[in-house]
Amino acid sequence: MRADDNPSARSLHAQFPGDDTRPTSKKELAGWYSYGWAAEVFTVCAMGSFLPITLEQMARDRGVLLSDKVTPCSASWNGTETTARTHGISPPWYGINATPGTSQCVVYILGAEINTASFAMYTFSVSVFVQAVLIISMSGAADHGSFRKTLLVAFAVIGSVCTMLFLSVVPKIYIVGALFAIVANTCFGASFVLLNSFLPLLVRHHPSLLGHENERSPELNHSHITDDRVQFAANADYGIDADATSPLLQPVQGDSDEHTTSRLPVTSVVISEELKLSTRISSLGIGIGYIGAVILQIICILVIIATRQTTFSLRLVLFLIGLWWFVFTIPAALWLRPRPGPPLPKAPQGKDNRSCVGYMVYAWKSLCRTAVRTRHLKDILLFLTAWFLLSDGIATVSGTAVLFAKTQLNMKPAALGLINVVTMMAGVFGAFSWSFVSRRLNLGASQTIIACILLFELIPIYGLLGFVPAIRKLGYLGLQQPWEMFPLGIVYGLVMGGLSSYCRSFFGELIPPGNEAAFYALYAITDKGSSIFGPAIVGLITDRYGEIRPAFVFLAVLIFLPLPLMLLVDVGRGKKDALALAVELEEGQSSNTQTYGTLSNCERNAVPTDQ
């Protein structure tokens, strides 16, 4: 009989009052997988395809042409089709090219003239900002007490309902659509942080590992597993730590509380088993989520074609995405156990800080403490700066490309959705192929990242070729025809497949041993926070020049800037500095008194998107 089929498997000792030490059940695992299947569709199908063009289209339906600022706008693909048919041309299903700038539209919000494409970019920037603030602020409440599952379900319901409500949003109230988009994206990010926080608990309490309990140190059941090999390798896919209580905010060396004891070594048997199990569960979760996203993406494309690719078609597929998210959240709500965390530590004055304000202060102080420690680590600062710029470029290129294809190339929604399918398939291929290429060419992690950046740089440079007079005369190349978006989507997918794994791996080599959770938190916040700026700047450029193509200059610079920073990172020096800091923190541990908070571990918001 397999271990996970054994209902009599022993549970671990409780580490705090109310600790749920029951073995992980198959139903609980199914609930965890179910939410990945439910929510991944939002980042892939909504944020990656249909939400940006829906916002742009609803604003367009209320806007006027940029050329005369009087003529009302209409759907770019419908308007172009009418022109094509007038000249006896049968337009293809994917759209037809138009003269750049002829279909650019503007709307007036609070007296300001805003390009309809910029409106979608500004909405994305605001949603990312709100998401980052919420994720940090709610971390304390998610870690301590029994709020983890409650918050996950609440965010899932709110986010999915807001997505479904797009069906009722008509162009006349397009601003309401932007508000729904902000709330939905914020709730998605927060819910996935909470989902990822369950994985270490599911692994730790899995029946197949409880048989190795005797091989642990006797005190291990009352300590956090912090071996750096486990912290990174076991959870590289989801970017989370493998500690016992799985907090979003957790103690590290130099901090202590009444629920944390000294760090103890873990036997190689336990490390190996937890590593294998965590990798298996997380990989399966990612695969299930992407399979669901591809299935729904194809369904959405068929629905859009069947409903003649109108604004209503876009609202309808967003309703379907929200409905999918809501329905498949139900098994997660029923089958996942709350798995509460330890009580919130008391403040230095001995006061109980379990109010909402107390939880938020706890979280922000923890994050700040981690940020302060990075000043001792030059190479981590260099890498995080590079990652800030690179992740901003990743998010901005995705949104910019979709809106460029719609407003400049007049591509139809079905074709835009198909680009996303092609990109996802290329991303899966890239995740495996980069590993093969790096081994074949004997490339290190940093060299592979640099290769990805150079390949990534080709995307905006290719778009800038459209400014070259000789190429413009050709009528193709330089992103002048819709079909050119598909090979660029393949390039983007290949790049994402490499960067998503190698950047995290490279960063892991620079972290002080025993501080993985805290520094991966900073890594994730850097990732999320950076996406505030790129889309907003692209929006400003689009408003200034009346079209998106000039923004490729900004994107080319944004993608290039991480390159010299990555070349300055010295792994050997970084490891040496990290070890020195770890020793310093270890030596100071015995002299530390009770602190208010612990270091933030918001790294659990690393998803796949996209986004």
Swiss-Prot record:
GO annotation, biological process: amino acid transmembrane export from vacuole; autophagy
Alphabetical list of InterPro entries matching this protein: Atg22, Atg22-like, ATG22/LtaA_families, MFS_trans_sf
GO cellular component terms attached to this protein's record: vacuolar membrane
Location relative to the cell: Vacuole membrane
Keywords, alphabetical: Amino-acid transport, Autophagy, Glycoprotein, Membrane, Transmembrane, Transmembrane helix, Transport, Vacuole
Family the entry assigns: Belongs to the ATG22 family.
Role played: Vacuolar effluxer which mediate the efflux of amino acids resulting from autophagic degradation. The release of autophagic amino acids allows the maintenance of protein synthesis and viability during nitrogen starvation.
Name this protein carries in UniProt: Autophagy-related protein 22-2
Organism of provenance: Aspergillus clavatus (strain ATCC 1007 / CBS 513.65 / DSM 816 / NCTC 3887 / NRRL 1 / QM 1276 / 107)
Gene: atg22-2
